[in-house]
Amino acid sequence: MVTDQGGGTSEADGGPVRHIPVLLKEVLAALDPAPGKIILDGTFGAGGYASAILDAGADVVALDRDPTAIAAGQSMMHASGGRLKLVHSRFSDLAEHAPAQGLDGVVLDIGVSSMQIDEAERGFSFQKKGPLDMRMSAAGVSAADVVNRAKVSDLIRIFGFLGEEKQAGRIARAIEKRRAETPFETTRDLANLIETVTPRKAKDKIHPATRVFQALRIFVNDELGELAHALFAAERALKPGGRLVVVTFHSLEDRIVKTFFQDRSGKAGGSRHLPLVTARAATFTPVGKPMVAASEEEASRNPRARSAKLRAGVRTEAPSPGADLSIFNLPELASLARLGG
């Protein structure tokens, strides 16, 4: 499933984007913040969750890999009376910023923030002309680097897996032909090409460029790898009884979170015909339902919530069995380092 992850209205809708914390009531219920607790918000963004957690009396350590978000949050930090700490960091490194006694909760809201989509110069939106960038931080490979340098076979895999784009081959070959004449520099350069190659049909609910832009953003920022590493980091950083709450917006992310909690449940079973058997001590037990979606009322008020899924678990006393990325069965894609030139 492909979705906008930017806030109040989707890119496909074409309306203004504003920040509305998704599933806020459900996130707070799963986290259970209270005075004396320390909660880590791994995706600070515009500070929606962090603000609500502070209001509930807990202290917050908030991370964001985007220096713009950290700068924008300074006023909130100063107003918190020392209860909010802001850190410029990837959330995959969250264990490095946890107190020695451990965390009482970790919340992750996966995806691009409304602030990033709003800024044309960040290059996240195909509806806003800007440099073809898409990096959540200033470092690393840009989307333009990928589009202009990646092999056609690599582009097909990136668009097909990360964007679930059925026309990946056609789009990749058109990119190869165009870049041989003129390199891609702006978001409109790429969006216009995609519109020409795969014109929008009356029945289409999303813009033809939606899936390719999603795929490039996920690839450039290694979002799936970051999420996988962050889940293992949270397992190490949470104290017994601490809670891990993750909100995702499309099937690739949700599959990773679901797989993680299943793997850490202490149960294993090969088919629906065989009973589950204990594999090892569980490191997480479920909080409420296995998956929580937004109510119809919230989805109508905030279109971003339509595809949101929340999964949560409580950390047990069992030791972490260690990080094993193979449980996620992620595909091997092109090397970001190689594409950087």
UniProtKB/Swiss-Prot annotation:
GO annotation, biological process: rRNA base methylation
InterPro entries referenced in this protein's UniProt entry, alphabetically: RsmH (IPR002903), SAM-dep_MeTrfase_MraW_recog (IPR023397), SAM-dependent_MTases_sf (IPR029063)
GO molecular function, one term: rRNA (cytosine-N4-)-methyltransferase activity
Name under which the protein is recorded: Ribosomal RNA small subunit methyltransferase H
One Gene Ontology term, aspect cellular component: cytoplasm
Disulphides: none
Gene that encodes the chain: rsmH
Enzyme kind, highest EC tier: transferase
Catalyzed chemical reaction(s): cytidine(1402) in 16S rRNA + S-adenosyl-L-methionine = N(4)-methylcytidine(1402) in 16S rRNA + S-adenosyl-L-homocysteine + H(+)
Family assignment from sequence similarity: Belongs to the methyltransferase superfamily. RsmH family.
